[in-house]
């Protein structure tokens, strides 16, 4: 005879299983999806929160991708993997406020796809939408996160140097598209995006499409776009409220996005590198009442007080002007150009002195070591190390509107940290560990975290955080 549970007994077993599942669902997750630990504690370290005073012999606890606790007397969860930070300094992860990491390179289009309206115009990349005939170089609906490639080999080198977040920008255009703020953490783009619509990039270079083919034409075109957007902004809600008897306005995705811009819901990056571009950008931003950051800022040394008076923020391009590697012997640089090369690294110090908030962009620099070399040029020209660190961390986060989650070491913020053996911008400093979204990347085979409950440093193979360069000579 077969035995079977009675209905009551079956219901009882189901109830027990359901209760067990509920308890498990509320238990702490000790490992991430990839089998990596979710809890860490860095102990006995010097901690530079940026938002507050430096802490000596302190601990920072990471739980489920977030900073759980920071301080000298912090309880360490029993499930945490521990890193002895003696002799090490913990900084917030660095933010590169403007780069093309992970972005596709523009490829020449077939001859048949050459620009409109002008004989011999340059090829237009096939993946870039030129828009309708009257909207050349205009694609504000493009979002960098949609094109982001996490397999870009530069991402690892940036991360090993201490960069945990980057504002990746679309290729240039008049209204090129929206930059995205990306954490340099995983292989899945969807898990890396901090803010997909982080900043709209504006360009003032004439297009290769035939129209507009001059700076004056570009500015006139932008004025037309803003005027069209203002009309759309008024017509669309009117029609939505009372459609009967009113001609339906055309749906225009450029104007839909630009409406958000005119309502200051997103920051706009205006090209503003020299003494001509900076005043122009400030005038246009004021004319259209845009939430703006000046992008470039290398001649800020000459206009710092004016920028401060207008209360604009700046993203400084760290790719300082320099002489060509193989210059034409007949092309003798002007005194103005030589002066620019000499004084550009002094712009961050001038901006800081004037009270201008600024961030740093790698701006096309090929190697992280050159980023830090150029930061040292700025500090040699008068910028303090503290101001340089803020430009890469909290000030960058504030400019980009994410200071509630990035830029400093505080409980509740994303666990983006860099652990080094000295001054982060020192020429001989070595990065030892990097955390991005709480994920551990070990840069140097030293001070391995030990398993919860153990005093040693051994870990099972399946729990070893992803390792990077073993020699620790990174980004200097």
Please annotate each region the language model reported:
Residues 106, 120-125, 129-130, 141, ...:
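His/Asp/Glu-enriched, well-ordered alpha-helical/loop segment
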Residues 33-34, 111-126, 450-476:
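Disordered, low-complexity segments in secreted/periplasmic proteins that are enriched in proline
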Residues 45, 398, 410-453:
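C-terminal cap of metal-dependent C-N hydrolases
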Residues 148-299, 430, 436:
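Polyanionic/metal-chelating signatures
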Residues 11-26:
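Bacterial N-terminal signal peptides
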Residues 1-11:
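N-terminal secretory signal peptides that target proteins for export/translocation
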Residues 34, 38, 47, 51-93, ...:
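Histidine-rich, glycine-flanked metal-binding segment
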């Amino acid at each position: 005879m077969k035995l079977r549970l009675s209905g009551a007994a079956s219901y009882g077993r189901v109830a027990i299983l359901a209760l067990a599942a509920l308890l498990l669902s509320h238990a702490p997750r000790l490992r991430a999806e990839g089998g990596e630990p979710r809890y860490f504690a860095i102990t006995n370290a010097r901690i530079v929160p940026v938002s507050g005073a430096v802490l000596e012999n302190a601990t920072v606890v990471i739980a489920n991708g977030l900073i759980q606790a920071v301080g000298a007397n912090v309880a360490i969860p029993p499930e945490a993997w521990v890193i002895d930070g003696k002799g090490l300094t913990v900084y917030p992860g660095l933010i590169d406020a403007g780069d093309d990491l992970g972005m596709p390179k523009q490829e020449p289009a077939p001859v048949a796809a050459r620009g409109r309206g002008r004989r011999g115009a340059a090829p237009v990349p096939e993946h870039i939408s030129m828009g309708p005939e009257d909207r050349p170089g205009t694609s504000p609906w493009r979002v960098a996160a949609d094109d982001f490639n996490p397999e870009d080999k530069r991402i690892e080198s940036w991360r090993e140097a201490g960069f945990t977040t980057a504002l990746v920008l679309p290729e240039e255009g008049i209204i090129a598209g929206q930059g995205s703020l990306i954490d340099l953490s995983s292989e899945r783009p969807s898990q890396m995006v901090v803010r997909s619509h982080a900043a709209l990039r504006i360009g003032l270079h004439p297009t290769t499409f035939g129209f507009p083919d001059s700076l004056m034409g570009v500015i006139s075109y932008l004025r037309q776009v803003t005027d069209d957007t203002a009309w759309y902004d008024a017509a669309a809600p009117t029609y939505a409220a009372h459609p009967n008897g009113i001609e339906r306005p055309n749906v225009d995705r450029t104007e839909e996005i630009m409406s958000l811009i005119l309502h200051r819901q997103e920051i706009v990056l205006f090209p503003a590198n020299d003494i001509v571009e900076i005043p122009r950008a400030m005038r246009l931003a004021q004319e259209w009442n845009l939430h703006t950051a000046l992008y470039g800022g290398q001649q800020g040394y000459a206009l710092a007080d004016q920028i401060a008076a207008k209360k604009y923020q700046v993203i400084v391009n760290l790719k300082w002007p320099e002489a060509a590697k193989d210059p034409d012997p007949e092309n003798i640089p002007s005194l103005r150009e030589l002066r620019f090369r000499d004084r550009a690294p002094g712009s961050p110090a001038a901006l800081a002195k004037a009270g201008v908030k600024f961030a740093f962009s790698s701006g096309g620099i090929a190697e992280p070591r050159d980023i830090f070399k150029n930061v040292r040029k700025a500090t040699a020209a008068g910028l303090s190390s503290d101001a340089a660190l803020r430009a890469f961390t909290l000030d960058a986060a504030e400019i980009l509107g994410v200071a509630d989650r990035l830029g400093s070491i505080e409980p509740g913020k994303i666990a983006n940290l860099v652990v080094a053996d000295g001054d982060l911008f020192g020429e001989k400093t070595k990065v030892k560990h990097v955390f991005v979204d709480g994920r551990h990347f070990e840069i140097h085979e030293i001070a391995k975290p030990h398993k919860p409950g153990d005093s040693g440093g051994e870990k099972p193979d399946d729990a070893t955080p992803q390792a990077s360069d073993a020699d620790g000579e990174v980004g200097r």
